[in-house]
Amino acid sequence: MAKKGIREKIRLVSTANTGHFYTTDKNKRNMPGKFEIKKFDPVVRQHVVYKEAKIK
């Protein structure tokens, strides 16, 4: 069987409280902290900060 990978799936949730989110993965070894990135939120039609959250 294959070894479990180092990358973990995460959810990027909009800080504009629209409920919109992106899913992606990140390398746990290179980025151990919480991930934040500015991306486009189609609900408010603006670029807003997205913060990392666990996938349920």
UniProtKB/Swiss-Prot annotation:
Keywords noted in UniProt: Ribonucleoprotein, Ribosomal protein
Disulphide connectivity of cysteines: none
Pfam families with a match to the protein in the record: Ribosomal_L33 (PF00471)
Annotated GO biological process: translation
GO molecular function: structural constituent of ribosome
CC per GO annotation: cytosolic large ribosomal subunit
Keyword Ion transport: no
Keyword check for Ribosomal protein: yes
HAMAP family for this protein: Ribosomal_bL33 (MF_00294)
Family: Belongs to the bacterial ribosomal protein bL33 family.
Matches recorded under NCBIfam families: PRK00595.1 (NF001860), rpmG_bact (TIGR01023)
Full protein name: Large ribosomal subunit protein bL33
